[in-house]
Amino acid sequence: MVDKWNLVVDVEECINCYNCTLAVQDEYAEVSHVGYSAPMPKHGHRWIDILRGERGGFPILDVSFVPTMCNHCDNAPCVAAAENGAVKKRDDGIVVIDPDKAKGQKQLVDACPYGAIWWNEDEQVSQHWNFDAHLIDDGWQEPRCVNVCPTGALKSIKVKDSEMT
């Protein structure tokens, strides 16, 4: 059995700095990664976003921050919704939307139960954060969002499925 990439999010450590979001925008905005992704629009897309939750009120207020992104699902609904093999779950666990094959496949946006797939109107293609697959394939040990997280709220690990249960 092959080890798979997983992103572990420790919500107790997230401080809402948005470094992860900025790293993704820096890597993908107006930049094409052939076979991996078309250029991400400069504005309007947050392939990694941070949801904010508030509980209580003054003087006792609890605020939480939850980074959200593509979960690279084991049984990814986007893979099932895709036509002509436009979305693939790789052996290493990473889900990749092929920017050429996915042209015009807006149904992929609705297929994601987590709202992690975005429609790029300019490119006419569905897009998501692909775990920086192009960097991983070039030998990087972690995606950029993990690399820039100042608190360690994001961790990438490569393990067998049985170790994640």
Question: What residues fall within each predicted segment?
Answer:
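Non-ligating segments of multi-cofactor redox enzymes
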Residues: 1-165
